[in-house]
Amino acid sequence: LFDAAHLLAPVAIASSLGLGHVKVPIVAPFNLGLNGNAITVSPALHAAIMSEIDGDPFDPMATALALARVVAKRRKSGAEPLTFGMTFPFSTHNYQLRFWMAAGGVDPDEDVRLVVLPPPYMVDSLANGHVDAFCVGAPWNSVAVDLGVGHILHFVADILVHAVEKVLAVRQ
């Protein structure tokens, strides 16, 4: 075991509750980062969302509603569900994607696929069409933009203010 570790905030909670892992009594006395994640989408998904937008394209609610329309059209046409990458099931990335999607009426468990990817694989997975979008921290969103394979749709700070990402976890 460890005395202290840098963890995704939800991992600390999940570990202390025994979710997905052996129960480890830990606490997280320090927050190490806020609001560093972003949602990046492929050029094709960006164009599809923008074609369905009704309102401000920088408003997370407007894009979530547009995403719901894109998802519905894809379902009606028989297309495969959109695939979204995130870093870990017990991560703010996962919860932030779910929160944003659900706000627009997209059921993250039924309407899309959520897959776990290590952050360094996100950009290649987007470029190769393995995912249509991802939620991750720096520098991967900017890398996708610099390479021309992605558009940053939202910074998570636009969706959830003061979203804790990383914590210092210690054994109780």
Residue ranges and their predicted role:
Residues 121-122:
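Short acidic active-site motifs
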Residues 1-109, 115, 128-163:
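Short, glycine-/small- and polar/acidic-enriched structural segments
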Residues 163-172:
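A conserved active-site cap/scaffold subdomain adjacent to cofactor or substrate pockets
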